[in-house]
A protein has these predicted regions:
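Extracytoplasmic small-molecule ligand-binding "clamshell" domains
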Residues: 30-105, 175, 265
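Periplasmic-binding protein-like
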Residues: 37-40, 115-119, 209-248, 269-272
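Extended ligand-binding regions for polar small-molecule ligands
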Residues: 57-66, 134-140, 145, 228-265
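Ligand-binding cleft/hinge of the Venus flytrap
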Residues: 60-67, 111, 147-176, 183-184, ...
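A ligand-binding cleft/hinge motif common to bilobed small-molecule-binding domains
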Residues: 80-86, 95-105, 155, 192-223
Length: 272
């Protein structure tokens, strides 16, 4: 018994040393709180059957985890996510349309996630094609709450916002199923057209198996949709700059092959 106690006492300094070494390392792991909305396949709410979080979340996880960050995710609708970032409840939101106009509550990273080509979804056989705002006359358009197209087409966003067009604009609310609902509304002839990121349209069309009833038409809106991460101004400036720098450097170093691999994982490609 005396021998066992002696062994135990000899172990105490070793245990104390290990605790002293390990605790600082454990405390250095910072938690990054990430708010994001459902925009498959770029950002996705996971489930037991489908645990994947999407292209951009995979990208985000790779960049920040490699620098020792723990990522905590909050799956919320876009409008709520923006408020949570502005209020400091989340540190960042991984994708938001880039704009040169300052926005209250957050700042952009320098490096974009992607510059997306847009396209439209219509019922199969519909001869309509986008040819400027005038071509939308009489068409029922779907969009989501808080969605902003002004960075790719000021005219398109003005059309959606104009009270005179209210009877032709359907704002579709939801949690994680807004785009799915819009596709079904087009199929059911409740709305006529919907514009979005081409990759999103490809993914949802394939997942809902609606190729026989709907079609993606190109070209879409005038400019590419440039999206960037946004970071809360509630974060102390030094910490915020470090988070932004980590993203910018990680995104710049990501190879084209890596990008393509992330996209192929979700079965989408950039259409030339």
């Amino acid at each position: 018994d005396r021998i066992e106690r002696s062994k135990m006492y000899r172990l105490i300094p070793i245990i104390a040393f290990l605790v002293a070494v390990c605790l600082p390392r454990m405390s250095h792991a910072e938690t990054l709180k990430v708010c994001y909305d459902q925009w498959p396949p770029m950002t996705m709410f996971p489930s037991e059957e489908a645990p994947a979080r999407g292209v951009i979340i995979d990208m985000l996880d790779e960049i920040y985890s490699s620098k020792g960050y723990d990522l905590e995710y909050f799956e919320v609708p876009l409008a709520r996510g923006l408020k949570m970032v502005a209020n400091g409840l989340c540190d960042m939101l991984p994708e938001f349309p880039a704009s040169e106009t300052p926005r209250e509550g957050f700042v952009y990273a320098s490096e974009e996630t992607f510059a997306y080509t847009t396209a439209f979804v219509v019922r199969r056989g519909d001869p309509w094609r986008y040819n400027g705002i005038e071509s939308m006359k009489g068409k029922r358009v779907a969009t989501g709450p808080g969605w902003d197209y002004s960075s790719i087409s000021v005219g398109y966003q003005n059309y959606l916002d104009n009270p005179k067009n209210a009877e032709f604009v359907e704002v579709v609310a939801g949690y994680d199923d807004v785009v799915d609902r819009i596709f079904n509304m087009i199929k059911e002839n409740r709305v006529d057209i919907y514009a979005d990121n081409d990759l999103v349209l490809q993914f949802v069309m394939k997942r809902l198996a609606m190729n026989d009833t709907l079609q993606i038409i190109r070209p879409g809106l005038e400019k590419k949709l440039v999206e960037k991460p946004i970071f809360s101004t509630k974060i102390p400036p030094k910490k915020r700059q470090k988070l932004i720098r980590t993203w910018d450097q990680g995104r710049m170093l990501m190879t084209r092959e890596k990008e393509t691999g992330l996209l192929k994982k979700y079965g989408v490609i950039f259409e030339e």
